[in-house]
C-alpha cells in the first residue's frame, strides 16, 4: 500500500490534520515533539464514480481504494545532524512514497511557533534544506563505495556513479532530483530511498476566518508565489481545526456545520487525499458485481495484465482477455446487460492500457 508522510516544523498543525484524516485520536500538544513514534492511519479514497456504480446494483459491499498516512514528528533546523531526534524522524520519511509537507499560514498567539514568526516560505526551506543535507551525506558515502567498482569498468556501478555525481552537484545548488531527473533515472537510484527524490505535496494550514477570504492571507500569497517560482504546484489550503471538528460529526451533520460557518463548498481534507493519490500518478479501475463493487489502485500507464495482478497474482500469470467498459457508459446504461446489448463492452488483450475509471472483468486461466 502506498503511503504519504505528513511532515513539517513543530506546531504547524500536522497531528491535528492527521487526526482528522484518519479519525484517530493522537496526542496533540502545544510543544515540540508531541509525536515521537510515527502514527499510522489507513484512509478510504472517496470516489463518486464508485458510489454511482454501486447505486445501480446495491452490492453487499462497497470497497474503496485505500491510502496510508503517517504522522512524522516535527522536524527542526539541524535534524540532518541529529537535532530534535532528527535522524530518527528522517529515517521515518525514507519509508514513505510521498511527502505531505504542512506549513503554517495562520496567526494564533496561543500556539507558539518554533521560530517565533509566521513565514511559510522560511519554514518550507528549513525542511527542504534538512532533506537535502541528509541526502547529501548519504550520496557522498555511496559515491565513495562505488568509485573503485566504477573505475574498474563495472557498467552498472559506473552508471549509478555518474548519476549520483549529477544529483550531488544539483543538491549543492538546492535542486531536488524529483524535479530534475527523468523517471528512468529516478528508478536507477530508487534503492537509496532519497528524501529529495520523493514527490512533495504542500498543505497550507490556515485559520477558519482565512477560509472565507484566502486573498487576505498574506502568508499564503507569499507561499504560493514562491512555489510558482520554483515550479511546484500551489499549496492545498485546509483548516486543520475545522477538519478535526468535522471528523467527529456524523456525515449528515457535517454539511450543516459547514453551512453555519459559511463554508458550503469547503472540501480541504478530501482534496488533500485526492491530491496525494494524483501526485503519485495513481488511477483506479473498478470491478462490478452483486457481491461487491470495488475500486483498485494502479499506476498510470499499466497494461491489463499488470492491473489484473492487483486483484491476484494468478490473474496476471494466466491473463487471457479483459472485458472493459468506461464507468460513465455503464452508469448511463444502468446495467451490464443493457451495455452488452448496445455493444459497449469491449474485449481487450494484454497490450491494452487500462484507463482511469474503466470497469473490468478479467478472463484468466492458470493450469
Curated annotation (Swiss-Prot):
Q: Which residues form the OBG-type G domain?
A: 2-258
What the entry lists under SUPFAM superfamilies is as follows: P-loop containing nucleoside triphosphate hydrolases, TGS-like
Question: GO CC terms for this protein?
Answer: cytoplasm
Q: Which cofactor does it need?
A: Mg(2+)
Protein role: ATPase that binds to both the 70S ribosome and the 50S ribosomal subunit in a nucleotide-independent manner.
Protein family per UniProt = Belongs to the TRAFAC class OBG-HflX-like GTPase superfamily. OBG GTPase family. YchF/OLA1 subfamily.
Q: What is this protein called?
A: Ribosome-binding ATPase YchF
Annotated gene: ychF
Amino acid at each position: 500500500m502506498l503511503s504519504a508522510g505528513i511532515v513539517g516544523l513543530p506546531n504547524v498543525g500536522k497531528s491535528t490534520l492527521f487526526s482528522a484524516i484518519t479519525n484517530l485520536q493522537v496526542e496533540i500538544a502545544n510543544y515540540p515533539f508531541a509525536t515521537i513514534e510515527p502514527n499510522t492511519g489507513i484512509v478510504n479514497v472517496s470516489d463518486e464514480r464508485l458510489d454511482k456504480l454501486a447505486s445501480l446494483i446495491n452490492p453487499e459491499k462497497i470497497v474503496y481504494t485505500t491510502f496510508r498516512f503517517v504522522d512524522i514528528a516535527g522536524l527542526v533546523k539541524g535534524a540532518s545532524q541529529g537535532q530534535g531526534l532528527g535522524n530518527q524522524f528522517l529515517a521515518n520519511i525514507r519509508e514513505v512514497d510521498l511527502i505531505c509537507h504542512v506549513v503554517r499560514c495562520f496567526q494564533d498567539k496561543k500556539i507558539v511557533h518554533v521560530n517565533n514568526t509566521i513565514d511559510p516560505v522560511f519554514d518550507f526551506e528549513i525542511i527542504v534544506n534538512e532533506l537535502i543535507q541528509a541526502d547529501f551525506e548519504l550520496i557522498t558515502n555511496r559515491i565513495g563505495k562505488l568509485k573503485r567498482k566504477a573505475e574498474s569498468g563495472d557498467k552498472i556501478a559506473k552508471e549509478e556513479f555518474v548519476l549520483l555525481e549529477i544529483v550531488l552537484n544539483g543538491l549543492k545548488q538546492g535542486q531536488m532530483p524529483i524535479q530534475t531527473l527523468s523517471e528512468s533515472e529516478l528508478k536507477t537510484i530508487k534503492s537509496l530511498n532519497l528524501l529529495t527524490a520523493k514527490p512533495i505535496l504542500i498543505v497550507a494550514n490556515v485559520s477558519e476566518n482565512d477560509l472565507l477570504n484566502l486573498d487576505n492571507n498574506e502568508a499564503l500569497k507569499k507561499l504560493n508565489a514562491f512555489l510558482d517560482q520554483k515550479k511546484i504546484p500551489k499549496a492545498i489550503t485546509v483548516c486543520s481545526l475545522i477538519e478535526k471538528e468535522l471528523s467527529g460529526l456524523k456525515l449528515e451533520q457535517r454539511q450543516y456545520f459547514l453551512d453555519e460557518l459559511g463554508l458550503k463548498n469547503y472540501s480541504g481534507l478530501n482534496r488533500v487525499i485526492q491530491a496525494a493519490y494524483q501526485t503519485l500518478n495513481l488511477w483506479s479501475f473498478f470491478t462490478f458485481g452483486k457481491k461487491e463493487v470495488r475500486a483498485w489502485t494502479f499506476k498510470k500507464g499499466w497494461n491489463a495484465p499488470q492491473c489484473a495482478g492487483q486483484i491476484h497474482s494468478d490473474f496476471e500469470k494466466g491473463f487471457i482477455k479483459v472485458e472493459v467498459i468506461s464507468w460513465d457508459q455503464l452508469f448511463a446504461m444502468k446495467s451490464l446487460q443493457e451495455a452488452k446489448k448496445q455493444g459497449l463492452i469491449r474485449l481487450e488483450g494484454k497490450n491494452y492500457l487500462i484507463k482511469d475509471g474503466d470497469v473490468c472483468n478479467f478472463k484468466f486461466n492458470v493450469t
